[in-house]
Amino acid sequence: MIDSTTELRPLTKRQQQIYDLIKAKIQDTGMPPTRAEIANFFGFKSANAAEEHLKALAKKGYIEMLAGTSRGIRLVEEMLEAEGLPLIGRVAAGEPILAQEHIEEHYKMDGNLFHPAADYLLRVNGESMKDIGILDGDLLAVHQTTEVQNGQVVVARVENDVTVKRFKREGNVVYLHAENEDFSPIKVDLANQEFNIEGIAVGIIRSGRWM
């Protein structure tokens, strides 16, 4: 069974080409290609050669092969997207924010409801951003990116801690401002401290309603 815990292994050049062809065919026609169509496209001598490449893609976790049909190919990424947005709870020090152990569940929502599209939801912990309506327990919709402008609300990692704050950069210093007068800004010296942007806030979900 293939699920969201599947660890994808790198593809060979030919495997990547076949994977890209499958995606393109699905986007253009709504259907994956047959083995014969794959063989014809790449000049293989038989459909069996295409079958072997498909088996390799399935073994590496990129597709699922369905028995009994010539077009029995399903992209795993589409299956995972159908689960909804991953909801991230507490993030362990030093671990990637989307590490499987951080995902509490998948929230049945289309990320394209937000602009730019949300890639995951982060459960808000604390009241440091309450003055702009981001409250403890809210689900913050986050677009995963490392590109950020001054004034944007970001999910940032300072050393091993993940925080939601308003971003401002001045030279080699970043200030992460709370939206609550009880909290002082976090000053980050980029020359001496580890700092990463995990994404920008694009919306809030509270009690099942997006805002």
Swiss-Prot record:
It is an enzyme of class 3 (hydrolase). GO terms for molecular function: DNA binding; serine-type endopeptidase activity. Coiled coil: none annotated. InterPro entries: LexA (IPR006200), LexA-like (IPR039418), LexA/Signal_pep-like_sf (IPR036286), LexA_DNA-bd_dom (IPR006199), LexA_repressor (IPR050077), Peptidase_S24_LexA (IPR006197), Peptidase_S24_S26A/B/C (IPR015927), WH-like_DNA-bd_sf (IPR036388). It catalyses: Hydrolysis of Ala-|-Gly bond in repressor LexA. Its EC number is 3.4.21.88. SUPFAM superfamilies: LexA/Signal peptidase, Winged helix' DNA-binding domain. Residues 35-55 bind DNA. Pfam families: LexA_DNA_bind, Peptidase_S24. GO terms for biological process: DNA repair; DNA replication; negative regulation of DNA-templated transcription; proteolysis; SOS response. The active site is at residues 128, 165. Keywords: Autocatalytic cleavage, DNA damage, DNA repair, DNA replication, DNA-binding, Hydrolase, Repressor, SOS response, Transcription, Transcription regulation. The record marks 93-94 as: Cleavage. HAMAP family: LexA. Represses a number of genes involved in the response to DNA damage (SOS response), including recA and lexA. In the presence of single-stranded DNA, RecA interacts with LexA causing an autocatalytic cleavage which disrupts the DNA-binding part of LexA, leading to derepression of the SOS regulon and eventually DNA repair. Belongs to the peptidase S24 family. Homodimer. This is LexA repressor. It comes from Colwellia psychrerythraea (strain 34H / ATCC BAA-681). The gene is lexA.
